[in-house]
């Protein structure tokens, strides 16, 4: 919880760096990037607050003398694929709750804003999340299909979170289905 709260504070402190980097990469306005950082920092705070709400539960059993329990455990590695058009908000959203639930994450950065997405990873590392907990992958646009296939097919990856176009979302959904992996799509 404390590391996510620290990451939120660091993100706020680095607002100017996010604005400068984002404007250079996508040409958007300072106001838009400032809003992105503010909302993303608050998403980290919300995820931090959720860490105290994650618990198991007792489930009524119809078998006399038996007790059923629901236990929540981390899934493992979660892949987030975030777009360029609201890069700080959407990448942070893909990472925050999986981290709060004890998972590790891989963010496949958008080819249009790799430095902005890399900054998110740097903030989380600086906040104290250990090596390998948050991983940011950048690549050339022409390598995207192979990168996505490798990420989705990797046996350590347990869930995929994608925000982007319907065309690419369909490809990711088909690939995830081939490996029987749950995918969350915002198209």
Can you say where each PLM-predicted feature lies in the sequence?
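N-terminal Rossmann-like NAD(P)+-binding subdomain of aldehyde/semialdehyde dehydrogenases
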Residues: 1-66, 126
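Rossmann-like NAD(P) dinucleotide-binding subdomain of oxidoreductase/dehydrogenase enzymes
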Residues: 56-187
């Amino acid at each position: 919880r404390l590391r996510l709260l620290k990451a939120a504070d660091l993100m706020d402190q680095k607002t100017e760096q996010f604005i400068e980097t984002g404007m250079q990469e996508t040409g958007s306005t300072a106001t838009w990037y400032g809003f992105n950082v503010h909302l993303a920092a608050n998403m980290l705070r919300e995820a931090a607050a959720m860490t105290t709400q994650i618990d198991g539960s007792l489930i009524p059993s119809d078998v006399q003398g038996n007790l059923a329990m629901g236990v929540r455990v981390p899934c493992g590695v979660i892949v987030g694929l975030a777009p360029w058009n609201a890069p700080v908000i959407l990448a942070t959203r893909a990472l925050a709750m999986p981290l709060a639930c004890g998972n590790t994450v891989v963010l496949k950065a958008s080819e249009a804003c790799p430095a902005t997405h890399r900054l998110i990873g740097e903030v989380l590392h600086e906040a104290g999340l250990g090596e390998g907990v948050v991983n940011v992958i950048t690549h050339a646009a022409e390598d995207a299909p192979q990168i996505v296939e490798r990420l989705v097919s990797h046996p350590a990856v347990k869930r995929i979170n994608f925000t982007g176009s319907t065309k690419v979302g369909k490809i990711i959904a088909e690939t995830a289905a081939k490996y029987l992996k749950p995918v969350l799509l915002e198209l």
